[in-house]
Amino acid sequence: MSDNAKTSATDIVQRIISLLTIILLAYFLFKEGLFSVDQRLLSLATIVLLASFLFIIFLVLFKWPLGNLNKKEIRRTIAIVTTSFYFGTLSMVLSGKLELTEEVGALIDGLKWAFMVVVAFYFGSRAVEDALKSKKSAEECPQNTDAEAG
């Protein structure tokens, strides 16, 4: 399979996941008024979030042609989906459209931890990659101090 086909396949996967996230958020925002949602819809959104995440992991682990996502694409997709779902759920509770039951509280607590892990992973792995690149470039281009001294 050519590189263009792999790139277009990864673009398709990213667009599908982004589209599902946008559709869910739009449904939350505009169904019967701002942030009107019931418990069944929240359960459906949780299932879609988990299915999207597991689909990405499945593609990468089994090295399907669609599974040639690079680190940046995986990191970006997971960060977008988790952040959108976390802030969507949090805003529904804060607006009062979603009743804060024990189950919803546990979901928000779990999403809070997932959000913190994703943010730490996203920025931490970028920092490590940048540090490794700068170290590698410094090793490849050593400065010749002997030539300057002579």
From Swiss-Prot:
Enumerate the transmembrane spans. 12-30, 40-62, 74-96, 106-128
Disulphide-bonded residues: none
User: According to its record, how does it sit in the membrane?
Assistant: Multi-pass membrane protein
Q: Where is this protein found? A: Cell membrane
Gene Ontology annotations for the cellular component aspect, listed alphabetically: plasma membrane
Give a yes or no for keyword Plastid in this entry.
no
Q: Which UniProt keywords apply?
A: Cell membrane, Membrane, Transmembrane, Transmembrane helix
Superkingdom field: Archaea
Is Membrane tagged as a keyword?
yes
What name does this protein carry?
Uncharacterized protein AF_0523
| Source organism (scientific name) | Archaeoglobus fulgidus (strain ATCC 49558 / DSM 4304 / JCM 9628 / NBRC 100126 / VC-16)
